[in-house]
């Protein structure tokens, strides 16, 4: 395909390319389309997890093994979604499977504490020095809700500070503004990676701020790392004004044994965890120093009540402990994130060689593909693009056998091999060869 000199020509070529890849996708996936239509009758939009939707209809995955998923039409894909970082161990890792089967044989839903509860808690506390004590929840969302509620209760203040582009769960989500179904906590929204503005807002609102909640890398908004200087500025301002600093390490805890906080040497007052911590089962956790967490000790007068039927789900506890003890050891963790750094560097080299508006942001095994040249330090830096460009890239990669996300987010699992990464690099190379000239297409008016 020859590039046309004008924007109008590029947009015409883009329409043709998108129509072609979409038609091929539709023809190849009749069973996924049928599943989507059936699901729409009982589920709004055909799903119960908004991020799973994409046009013209999403693939319906039926089985998975190792680093691959298979859809209802029988197509096998290399999985670069990694369940948005929850699928760290790949699909049915032997050590996780063994723990799950042993748990199944031993019974479930005890209605009591179990040895697995203290076992997983001890493993978490050993990895995160800032977490002296921890409590479990059923999701990262719930962990963040409880951390914020704890901060508000122990400080006696009601407001929280979050950041543009922050995602802390389905009810604590901030793009450029607060989402309609967010919990009604009084809040301030500050620009991400702007240390001076963040310090100013903390200083001017210290009398009502209970906590500052921040992701060391914003996943949902595009794999955008926080600079060390930004996080250090938050630590300094929070310490100076008795505001609790909460690190949402639901995703970034995979970057080092003690998470991103260990890598940077910045100690938060509280930390939230989730995703892979439960070994692939629904899980969340929040923790911090004993002086804060002791408010949940039910043997103490006036203790805070934290119920939850599945907080100590034995499958989550035992699978999570097996994963941390037997699989995700520090050397394995380092190798996984080195592989991610290598993949991201290779993708950047491709962009430079093709002269294409394309880049991969992120840290370690967490990354996001962007269709622009300009550096990205916050959601404000993400240029408006014709959404058909993302559709073109996404469906093209699916057509080549790579299961990815529409927004370009990629997380590596331990099952991903060097050859899988090489295959993805080759697929992106071919995409840029055939369609790179379209990536400068003007956004729709």
Per-segment meaning from a language model:
Residues 119-211, 218, 341-344:
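PLP-dependent aspartate aminotransferase-fold enzymes
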Residues 215-228, 242-264, 270:
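Conserved PLP phosphate-binding loop immediately N-terminal to the Schiff-base lysine helix
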